[in-house]
Amino acid sequence: MNSVNIIAFRLLLTSLLLCSSFLLVTRAQTPSPSPSPSQPSSSQPATKPDDKAAKDDGNPFAPEPAPPLPAGMTGSDTTDPRYKLKPGIYDAGEAAVGIKHLLLLKKPEAFQLGASDPNDPKVQKVLGLFGANASDLAKIPKPVQLVTAQLAFAHSDMAFQGNHLFLGNFYGMNIYDISNPAKPTLLTSMVCPGGQGDPSVYKNLLFMSVEMPNGRLDCGTEGFPPPPPKPTPSPGEEPKFSPPPAQKDRFRGVRIFDISDIRNPKQVAAVQTCRGSHTHTLIVDPNDKDNVYIYVSGTSFVRQPEELAGCSGEAPDKDPNTALFRIEVIKVPLASPQDAKVVSSPRLFMDPRTGVLNALTNGGSHGKDGAEKPQESNQCHDITAYSAMGLAAGACSGNGLLLDIKDPANPKRLDAVNDPNYAYWHSASFSNDGKKVLFTDEWGGGLGARCRPNDPNKWGADAVFQIEDNKLKFGNYYKMPAAQGDSENCVAHNGSLIPIPGRDVMVQAWYQGGLSVVDFTDANHPVEIAYFDRGPMYPNMLALGGYWSTYWYNGRIWGSEIARGLDIFELTPTKYLTQNEIDAAKTVHLSELNVQNQQKIEWPHQLVVAKAYIDQLERSKALPADRIASLRQAIQSAEHSNDGAALAKLKELAPSLDESAGT
């Protein structure tokens, strides 16, 4: 999630020192005029709608129809069953193909705002914790107050370990026992505000991102006193932002908890960083068994040096030690996590020949023939590591990066790409073979309705790249195809691979656009094969809701629903996905899942895996029908045979079918 929109930021800037969702003036939501990777360099993209335009009533979150579809662009499908579903919080209409909704676990009471009226005293109380006084609140439209207060209790990302699910929240963390997926139970609710609360887990350690200025070292809920009122800007003058006053007890960075006692996590370290931690990536170095590494992506404002020595938000030409244009690397000794510390601050955007820190301001490796001015890349939003390949993919505001992480403390940029259809490079996922990477664009920052009928299907979409000789080669875009309403925040967000052998399939969150399962085996023709969606939370108000993350873990799809709670799903067979393929995916059992630390999937030698490949060979017509029939007959005979040698031989056949299978 990135900047909501500029007008909301300007309204809140004078009063609330909130998270980076509102504080990043540098994240313009307009496309670059550089040429598209999929078009000749002479082509110029259309102009995106102006996210800075305020409504007459001063409410930037009031539903507003999309402007006319730009010439040559394709919008979203209004004939899709997901369009115009009945609104509601817990009784919204639903539409699904290939997905069965099993259960919704509502948020624990402590993690709910408990108010839908901006005049509710609970709203003012929450905003007060962010440092807003009565004078500040008088300047902020009521709908903005409500949306801001809702954000303070938003569910965020997830991590998994054994039979435990760790569900982050801007207000802390909830830990569930999922040993019985049909009846998960809440083990621990840990109140610890500071947002976003994104988690990772490794052995007995839990890591949590914190970036908001109400975060405290002691996990306290009292926040900090509001700063003194600022002078009212002159007519036409932009409000000037300054970081909140230094506080010795403020925490912005990565918390580390010992979860040896899962019901009673103990904070053992709190590593401060200049911009806080919007997200982080756990790096497990196969050559270093004694340490793990954390890549910290900070996207918020730079704090004052009086609060953390060495912090500077100056431009690189004014201060070469600026906290902009870098990430931080934390080294965590597993035997003594209390000694965790920042060991490097890699300049991923630097030109190694000239030493210029902001070298990617004018783009990456393609589109050099046209005028360029992509989003300035002074931060990464998310970095996905694939340690088995020694690679990482960085989604870094104005660019997508390919990184060499063989030396995890010193990642090196291998390639960088930009795209005029992308507003904000948000996250990334590798294919299992490491030959493709799928990036996402969070156009509108997560609080924008960006799947309306006239919103182009190349904006706020996925972009699939092939990796060839350590370079990123563009394939095509994918966007959840169904049109959504004006009150539904919708854009590409977090997802994970589903371990279907022979295919690259990902389940992905689209906020109130629901979840979409995309097959990107063919990088040039990604296609949706399953989905689930609910109607909008409210018919006439654009509020933060929907899926932050949807991840596959050990046979189920788990959805972090921002406003409602935790959803659990299972796949069902369709013409695009057979029961054998689903069963083959269920043979993969992970002991741990941190999606930004991607693991190589390996399938056991089981006959159901061979059955899945045969189904794919039949679907793609790669083998004649009589050959398909004979293979199936051989498997069926072996399953009912006592001939162990024949059965073992057929099991060995399963992986050998991989090269022939296709979709």
Q: Which residues are covered by each model-predicted region?
A:
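Bacterial N-terminal signal peptides
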Residues: 10-23
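Hydrophobic single-pass membrane-insertion segments
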Residues: 25-27
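Soluble extracellular-acting proteins and domains
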Residues: 581-663
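Feature marking well-ordered beta-strand scaffolds used for ligand recognition
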Residues: 29-613
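N-terminal secretory signal peptides that target proteins for export/translocation
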Residues: 1-9
